[in-house]
Amino acid sequence: MTGNIDQLMKDMARDLLGEDVIDVLSFLLDNKTELTDEEMANKLNVKVNEVRKKLYALAEHGLVSYRRTRDKETGWYVYYWKANVDQINELLLSRKREILNKLKARLEYETNNEFYICPEDKTKYTFEEAFENEFKCPKCGVQLVYYDSAKMREFLERKIKEIEEEIARETKVGSS
């Protein structure tokens, strides 16, 4: 089960932040303990500033967290980092809510606009854009044709319903 969660976290990090944070996240997941940024930098053979930059990006999305203590000898703060494996469900729910909001915004855009499309390059324009260009494609000059976005709206409505049901199920399971 841990392998699945680790992979899920890596996939999420890759989707949100790209490939460069995976080395630091993988290292934290593999070690299963709290580590300082200096320890990670030494083991990964990377500059401490690079590791910190990646850790801050991961923390911003809730994938890692830290505990801060003061070094008694130097008086400096030491940060101990760990992967938030135990919070993966909350992270996934949060991500689904973000996607849901984007889909709802897109549905509203599709519902509140009339569209025209270029038959050549398939670029879609709102009525206002088409009107400004005299219903000709600004790229190639071809006459724009009316585009019925009913299928797109149906698709978005279906996806919104699916994600809302998933969120409701997962919220119910999480609270029981």
From Swiss-Prot:
Domain named HTH TFE/IIEalpha-type: residues: 5-89
Keyword terms, alphabetized: DNA-binding, Transcription, Transcription regulation
GO molecular function: DNA binding
Family annotation (InterPro entries): TF_E_archaea, TFE, TFIIE/TFIIEa_HTH, TFIIE_asu, TFIIEa/SarR/Rpc3_HTH_dom, WH-like_DNA-bd_sf, WH_DNA-bd_sf
Domain of life: Archaea
Keyword Protein biosynthesis: no
Signal peptide from the UniProt entry: none
UniProt keyword annotation of DNA-binding present: yes
A single BP term in Gene Ontology: regulation of DNA-templated transcription
One protein family per Pfam: TFIIE_alpha
Coiled-coil parts of chain: none
Subunit structure of this chain's protein: Monomer. Interaction with RNA polymerase subunits RpoF and RpoE is necessary for Tfe stimulatory transcription activity. Able to interact with Tbp and RNA polymerase in the absence of DNA promoter. Interacts both with the preinitiation and elongation complexes.
Domain commentary: The winged helix domain is involved in binding to DNA in the preinitiation complex.
Family: Belongs to the TFE family.
Biological function: Transcription factor that plays a role in the activation of archaeal genes transcribed by RNA polymerase. Facilitates transcription initiation by enhancing TATA-box recognition by TATA-box-binding protein (Tbp), and transcription factor B (Tfb) and RNA polymerase recruitment. Not absolutely required for transcription in vitro, but particularly important in cases where Tbp or Tfb function is not optimal. It dynamically alters the nucleic acid-binding properties of RNA polymerases by stabilizing the initiation complex and destabilizing elongation complexes.
Stated name of the protein: Transcription factor E
Species this chain originates from: Metallosphaera sedula (strain ATCC 51363 / DSM 5348 / JCM 9185 / NBRC 15509 / TH2)
